[in-house]
């Protein structure tokens, strides 16, 4: 979700089981996102609430997807059993390993590789997170303008340093 100036305000993944849509996001954003989504309810019957105490997100075994999954949305009462089941077919890793996988795949995380001025055009997420041909959304004017100009003011890139000591050129 963008702010009115086109800056990325919220980043989340959706999980839809056919009757309920869950948004998974980093800690600390739920309260303000719930307030925003509640204000955006117009004609549809939608209940917005924090289900953090009821569900957990686990990285499931398997090849990484374009969002870093597969992920499993698991009722908290079943987390220990699910972790044991996953552990039978995969090696448990910490969050640093998952972050390394995310960075290697070029998936920025809000407030980690971005700042309060970041726009989707700079982050390489236009094709997967922003639709350029339909709808009306906050920040659309900024995103469309930068897209049409073809040159974002900044661009997030991966820089790989091999550790070599190159030294400075002779003067």
Please place each PLM-identified region on the residue numbering:
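Basic, glycine/lysine-rich polyanion-binding surfaces/domains
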Residues: 1-171
């Amino acid at each position: 979700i963008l702010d009115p100036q086109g800056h990325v305000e919220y980043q989340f993944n959706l999980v839809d089981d056919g009757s309920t849509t869950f948004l998974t996001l980093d800690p600390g954003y739920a309260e303000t996102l719930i307030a925003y989504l509640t204000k955006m309810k117009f004609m549809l019957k939608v209940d917005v609430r924090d289900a953090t105490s009821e569900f957990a997100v686990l990285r499931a075994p398997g090849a990484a997807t374009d969002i870093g999954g597969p992920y499993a949305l698991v009722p908290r009462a079943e987390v220990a059993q699910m972790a044991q089941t996953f552990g039978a077919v995969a090696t448990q890793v910490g969050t640093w390993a998952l972050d390394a996988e995310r960075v290697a795949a070029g998936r920025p995380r809000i407030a980690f590789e971005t700042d309060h001025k970041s726009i989707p055009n700079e982050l390489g997420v236009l094709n997967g997170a922003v639709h350029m041909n339909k709808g009306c959304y906050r920040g659309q004017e900024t995103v469309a303008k930068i897209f049409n100009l073809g040159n974002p003011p900044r661009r997030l890139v991966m820089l790989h340093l091999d550790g070599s000591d190159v030294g400075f050129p002779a003067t």
